Structure formats: structure tokens, C-alpha cells
Amino acid sequence: MTLPFADSAQSTLGIEWELALVDAVSGELRSEAPDLLRALHVAEGLADDDVNPHMTSELLQNTVELVTGVHERVDAATADLGRIAARVADAAAARGISLFCQGTHPFADAIAQPSTPSERYDRMLDLTQYWGRQLLIFGVHVHVGLDDVSKAMPVVNGLVNRVPHLLALSASSPFWAGTDTGYQSQRTLLFQQLPTAGLPFQFQEWEDFERCVAQMEQVGMIADVTECRWDVRAVPRLGTVEMRACDGLATLEEIAAVTAYTQCLVDDLSASLERGETVEVLPPWHAQENKWRAARYGMDATVIVDARGTQVPLAEHLPAEIERLTPVAERLGCEAELAGVQAMIDDGGAARQRRVEAQALAGPPAEGEDADDAVAPLRAVVLDAAARTRASLDGRTG
């Protein structure tokens, strides 16, 4: 099998943002994506058989996925994403719906959510059964272009080393089915239950990857390469590597920060390969442990940074990483966005959600709420995230 790797300019990028539709008052999920997308399709002046590449359906009818075009700079990509999201948000608001993005919805019943009719989704749900029906999860995916297919596998390996960093930064799913899981990213634990999800296998050469995909197809593990749903993967048809480990993020500012970090990592790895250097590959047992620690502890995790087993607190290693990559960011024009990583370290993700829940528990019930309503504190978490998304789209502080 050969998997042609599309031509792509080095370090160009695109972003995918998975957003849930929630009731603007109750915070409960609304399975109205098919109707909303249909209305937007008409509003965009598209014919019935046209494809809108920027607004698409997802596994569940409560979810829309927004996709940017290809850009050279992070600011242009996030501006593009903001324009797309604003159109969706306005159309949703007319229906009493808000946009919500965190790694999971904190109190919804996952199995009760209707799926989008699709041969691909139906096949996946039939295969995965209970665990497939648990995938009430939302993420942010970042694609970065590579100008040479020979870089793809080493760059994927290098990005695996930084999965815990990006996961901890974005971790935003401590709650599941009304319960605090004790984890920072419940989404991570859910998604890796799929047989073709999780960390990728480690290859040095593109031919090894092609051989793996061919064998997976041969034995019926996958129908095609797109069903390799790894946390980091090469995407042959786009000529990119894709970082998929991040939990959902509520604001454009947060998305810009993780996008800048990802773009800088890929560009730095590409440059090192051009200098003839070798990308260090963490032993898979270290990579697996790092991912689990980030999902469990978030920014409080200690990560393994080399094959010798050196361990460093993530809260120390990540700022050092940002400092190391700042010259790369200056060249790429994303220095300001990369600097936004520090704000996420200070106040992002699961820590914020738990703080919102605690404040709701300590305060009086909101107007119209029952003091004994166990869902109320988690409703506050949903509405806080939705408000931050709306503020970010409106150009206010998210």
C-alpha cells in the first residue's frame, strides 16, 4: 500500500473546533445540529448538494465541528475560526441555544444523546457498543503542514513527547454524569477506549506507517487510514500532522495559545531534521505514563522528559518550553499567542471549572432554581463556559 502525502507548505496550519449546542438557560444539550447546519447552509447561499467545508456535523446531533481554511499565521487562523463560529453562534442564539466547549458535558446522560445518521458513524457505534455511545466529548484539533513526507513520522514522535503538555494545558473535563471524577481530563479516559484511539505507534519511516495501515485494513481493524484516531497522527490527504490530544477549549484566546505551541513545536522539529539531527523517541511506557499523569493531575503532573527517566514538574517544564520556543514564535509571527500559554497555566482548564462549581455550591440558588437541585452547580459550569465563548467571539475578554 502507498499513502501519497499531499503537497503542503511547511508550518501552515488549520484548526478544527468541536462545539456542543446547549440550552441557553438550562445548560442541557440540544440535539439540533442537523437543523442548525441546514439553516446555515441555506444562509450561506449553498445548493443542496454543495459541501460546506467550514461547518460540519459530528458523531452526535448535539455537536457541530468548525473548520478553518489553511493559514500561515496563528492570528489569521483564529480570526477565521472566530468568523465562522460567530455565524454559528448567532444562528444558534435565535433558537435559544449557546455554544459550549469543554472536554465533556458535566451532567448529561451520554447514552441518551442521538447520533448523526451516517454509515461511518453507524459502523463505529456497532463495533464499539457501550464505549462508543459514551463519546460525549469535545476537542480542538490542530493541523500543521510538512513540506517533506520524510519528516512526518519523526515529527509525530516528537509531538508524542509533548502530548502531556498540551493535554494538561487544555484539560477541561473533570466532571462526568454529575460526578467529579478526580481527573482533569475525563475525555482522555473515554476516547482511548476505542481500539484505534490513544497514542500512535512509533515509526521512523513513512513506509513503516504505510505497512501498518495496510495490515490494519487487511485484518479489518479499520476501513481506511482516517479511522486511525490517534492522539497525534499524520494526515496524508492534507500533507499535515494533526495534534488531537487537547480537550475542548472555550475561547479563541486559548485556542490561539495551543495552536501557537503546536505550530512552534512542529516547525522546531522540522528544522532540527533539516540540520540532520535525530528526534528523541520516548519509550512507549514513558509516553503512556505521561499521558495518564496529565489526564489525572493536569498542570500538577510530573512528566518523564527523556529515555533515562528524568522527571520534571510540568509546571516548570512547560514555561521553559515556551521560553525555548519564543525565537521560533517570533519568526512565525505568533509570539503573542504563544505567550498566552502562561495565562492558561495560571487559570485554565479543570481548576477553573472546579472553582465555578464551588462558588455555585457556596452561593444562593440562582433565580428560579431549587436549593436542592444537585445539577445546579454543574449547570453553572456549563453556562460559565458558554458565556466565555460568547464573550471571546464578541471580542471581549473570554
Curated annotation (Swiss-Prot):
GO terms for biological process: modified amino acid biosynthetic process. Its EC number is 6.3.2.2. InterPro entries: GCL_type2/YbdK_subfam, GCS2, Gln_synth/guanido_kin_cat_dom, YbdK. It catalyses: L-cysteine + L-glutamate + ATP = gamma-L-glutamyl-L-cysteine + ADP + phosphate + H(+). Keywords: ATP-binding, Ligase, Nucleotide-binding. GO terms for molecular function: ATP binding; glutamate-cysteine ligase activity. Pfam families: GCS2. It comes from the Bacteria. Belongs to the glutamate--cysteine ligase type 2 family. YbdK subfamily. ATP-dependent carboxylate-amine ligase which exhibits weak glutamate--cysteine ligase activity. HAMAP family: Glu_cys_ligase_2. This is Putative glutamate--cysteine ligase 2. It comes from Micrococcus luteus (strain ATCC 4698 / DSM 20030 / JCM 1464 / CCM 169 / CCUG 5858 / IAM 1056 / NBRC 3333 / NCIMB 9278 / NCTC 2665 / VKM Ac-2230). The lineage of its organism: Bacteria, Bacillati, Actinomycetota, Actinomycetes, Micrococcales.
